[in-house]
């Protein structure tokens, strides 16, 4: 042990740096650009689903929820009839980790859901909104049905997916990309997508250099030197 000139003891510095002495730095795991489709392709897919899908009224409402609100497939399939507040124009969404959010219901999405309830949803005891087309009329067990419908739409329209295994998540990425390129602030994009961390939303900043400059934060150490 060492001593000061006055005889007081001092604590010796550790000889080596360990994981307990070095602060952790948060790293963004996914550095790739988000995969997306242009708005014209998204609208073409929605129109194909509405007209050509075997159960177009139902499928169109499901796809609109993903394309307009950025919902994930499990979130769409978890929606119950009572989650829709028609007077307030809001939708309760059950997200990851038991998260609950109330989102505004766009007019076209509300109209599509209303048409499904009125014209296409079979009579059933379940309160799940979207049900299978055969008895017993219950909710979906396999979320891959949405990706299969999307694959058929892309094949019919000769639209090439930006990644082979991206599936229906491309609708969510495409919504975020469209918002960023329209000048929407990144924190607002994160609010729409209901990201827990701002770091998750930052992958979309790489799409537009001008928008990236507007959200860049100065490094605190750099400010101190000025």
Describe the residue ranges of each PLM region.
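Conserved catalytic core of the tyrosine transesterase superfamily
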Residues: 1-226
